[in-house]
């Protein structure tokens, strides 16, 4: 893991990745592609340490409310999220400023933030997507070795 100060956190389409890289080890992962020009090993997670400040600034300056998307390139609930809480802080900001959320994950750690997800959904809209690759627990551990099994999801 290494930290990096970034210049922006939201894409033009309101996508947000708080982390860059992944430790899930999914054999089918597209985010490993060299077309994304990562300058470090994919498993060496880049933590966007100034993400919360940038997100708050971006949300304050938006003229229209919209859905903020996260989880497309890096799971927002990687194992280190338990300690860093960048996703939780971002959800607090999204909730506070009244934006919607679309979040993708393979982790049951999302349950930690159920209070915020419910609050966002009451005010606007919150869509949670979870990958369910296979219900075969043994196969799941082979194709997604470092994440909770489909049964836990």
Q: Model-found features: residue ranges?
A:
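Conserved Radical SAM active-site core
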Residues: 1-129, 135-138
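Glycine-rich S-adenosyl-L-methionine
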Residues: 146-153
